[in-house]
Amino acid sequence: MKRLIFTDLDGTFLNHHNYSFEESFEALQKIKAAGVPLIFTTSKTKAEVEYLQEKVGISEPFIVENGAALFIPEGYQGFDLSFLEKYDDKRIMVFGKSYAKVLEFYRRYKERCSMAGLSDMSDEEIVHLTGLNQRDVIHAKQRDFTEPFILKDKTKLEALKKSAHTYELKITKGGRFYHIMSKFQDKGIAVIKTIELFEDLYHERVSSIALGDSENDIAMLEHVDIPIVIKKYDGSYLETNVPHIQKSSYQGSKGWNEMVLKYV
């Protein structure tokens, strides 16, 4: 049976503190040798993922900005993808709203709800909050669908969620930021649509694995055959009600390597 691997990045494939993936080397080699699509499924932007793929040495489909869109390299595995919209050198399936719509809401509510969005932060502030380097910050600000933000007053969260609902938007929590996004998108919906697409392309059922560590990964974990939680940097685990959930023994990329080797 064909397989797909969906993976979160920060705190899962990448270590929380230094963004390293060195300890995943053995599993990466096994995935490449087996020809299994490794689908980064992340809150990161297209620019961020493309740069990371270059460093990892892969050219695979990927899901960006918390399930907002799936990008597939043109001609991937020889598939005819002409039925999908073209975006640069990729084909795209869009699940989210435009960044302009998201920013309209953010700017209306940022003061009354004590939000500080990525679009308002200086590069220096983002470096301080994330530990990213200057180049990575530039990539992170090239957004198409969602706005990450810091909530200075947590008591405003419920009111903010209600307001977002009236705009057909929602608020979700990632590893470092909250995110404003379309009400009708999440990693789970993107995973479902991606699995359906690959089953059509392969003309057979596929087996799916997902690895994550944060609240915004739960929807992804709920819709795969083998859901895996990676131990957090502080030694805790994401709490879920997902049946048959697997847990890594190690944190970050070492835990990712451990679990991928177990199932690929």
Predicted feature residues:
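Short hydrophobic/aromatic-enriched beta-strand-loop microsegments
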Residues: 59-65, 135-137, 227-232
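Non-catalytic pre-domain segments flanking phosphatase-related domains
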Residues: 1-7, 55
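Mg2+-dependent phosphoryl-transfer enzymes with acidic/Ser/Thr/Gly-rich catalytic loops
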Residues: 4, 21, 178-264
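Residue-level detector of anion-binding/catalytic polar loops
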Residues: 37, 170, 226-227
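Conserved ATPase-coupling elements of RecA-like P-loop NTPase cores
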Residues: 16-20
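Conserved acidic, metal-coordinating active-site core of Asp-based
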Residues: 105, 109-209
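Active-site phosphate-binding/coordination module
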Residues: 21-118
